[in-house]
Amino acid sequence: LKIAAFNIRTFGETKMSNATLSSYIVRILRRYDIALIEQVRDSHLVAVGKLLDDLNQDDPNSYHYVVSEPLGRNSYKERYLFVFRPNKVSVLDTYQYDDGCESCGNDSFSREPAVVKFSSPSTKVKAFAIVPLHSAPSDAVAEINSLYDVYLDVQQKWDLNDIMLMGDFNADCSYVTSSQWSSIRLRTSSTFQWLIPDSADTTATSTNCAYDRIVVAGSLLQSSVVGPSAVPFDFQAAYGLSNEMALAISDHYPVEVTLT
C-alpha cells in the first residue's frame, strides 16, 4: 500500500486547466493508493472535480476522495484533500480537529488537521488514521509540537494507536533549526518514528530542505512500514523535466511510504 503527501503549490482551477501540468499531476498521484494533497485553493471544488475526472478516466472507480472545508485564519484558505483507491482502502471516519478559538487568537494551527481513518485489509495494520498538516512557516515549531495534542485526541476519540502524521511541516532550514527540535514533543517522544530524515530534500527548488515529513506511531503501523520506502519522489528526475516545468507543477516533491 503506497501512501504520499504532496504539497501542490496553489492547486486550483488555473493549474488543473493546464493540460500539461494536470497530466503530470495525475501521473504522479496514480503512483499512490492514498495521497494527501495540500495547498488546495479551490472554493467551489471545480479543480478537485477535474482531478477526479482525470484520475478516473479509464475506470470510474479508480479513485474516491475526501476533502476538508477551506481552512485558514483570514481570507486566505486552503483545503486538505485525500484521494484514495477504494479497491485498496476505505474511509471509516473523518473529523476536523478543534484547535481552539480562532477569533480569540488561541488556536494552535493556521490550518487545523482534517483527520481521516482508513481501513486497509491488505496490510498488517488493518485500520489507521492519517493526520495532515501544512504548517504556517513562521509557526512551524509550535504547530509541529501541537501535533502531539492531535495525536492524543485521535488516539482517544477512535481508541486507535496506529496514526500517521504527514504533510508539509516546514520542518527544516530557517523554519525549524537544529536547536529547536528539543522543544518539539512529536520529535522527543519515543512514540513516534520520523520516516523522512532531516537530511532529505523535499523541495523542487534549489534549496535543500526536509520540509515534508511522514511520522508514524503505533506498533502495528510501524511494523507495516517497508524499511527504506519512505523517500521524496523526485518527479523532475523521474520524468526528465526542466527546472521550469518541475516548478510549474510544484515547489515540493511528494513524500511517500509503502506499507505491507
Swiss-Prot record:
Record's catalysed reaction(s): Endonucleolytic cleavage to 5'-phosphodinucleotide and 5'-phosphooligonucleotide end-products
Names of the cofactor(s): Ca(2+); Mg(2+)
GO molecular function, one term: DNA binding
Broad class of where this protein is predominantly found: secreted
Ribonucleoprotein keyword on record: no
Compartments where found: Secreted; Zymogen granule; Nucleus envelope
Any single Pfam family the record assigns to this protein: Exo_endo_phos
Marked site positions, Nitration by tetranitromethane destroys a Ca(2+) binding site and inactivates enzyme: Y65
Alphabetic keyword roster: Actin-binding, Apoptosis, Calcium, Cytoplasmic vesicle, Disulfide bond, Endonuclease, Glycoprotein, Hydrolase, Nuclease, Nucleus, Secreted
Enzyme Commission (EC) number: 3.1.21.1
A Gene Ontology term for the protein's cellular component: nuclear envelope
Cofactor notes: Divalent metal cations. Prefers Ca(2+) or Mg(2+).
Domain of life: Eukaryota
Catalytic site positions: E78, H134
Broad EC category: hydrolase
Gene Ontology biological-process entries: apoptotic process; DNA catabolic process; neutrophil activation involved in immune response; regulation of acute inflammatory response; regulation of neutrophil mediated cytotoxicity
Function: Serum endocuclease secreted into body fluids by a wide variety of exocrine and endocrine organs. Expressed by non-hematopoietic tissues and preferentially cleaves protein-free DNA. Among other functions, seems to be involved in cell death by apoptosis. Binds specifically to G-actin and blocks actin polymerization. Together with DNASE1L3, plays a key role in degrading neutrophil extracellular traps (NETs). NETs are mainly composed of DNA fibers and are released by neutrophils to bind pathogens during inflammation.
Family (UniProt): Belongs to the DNase I family.
Protein name stated in the entry: Deoxyribonuclease-1
Organism, scientific name: Ovis aries
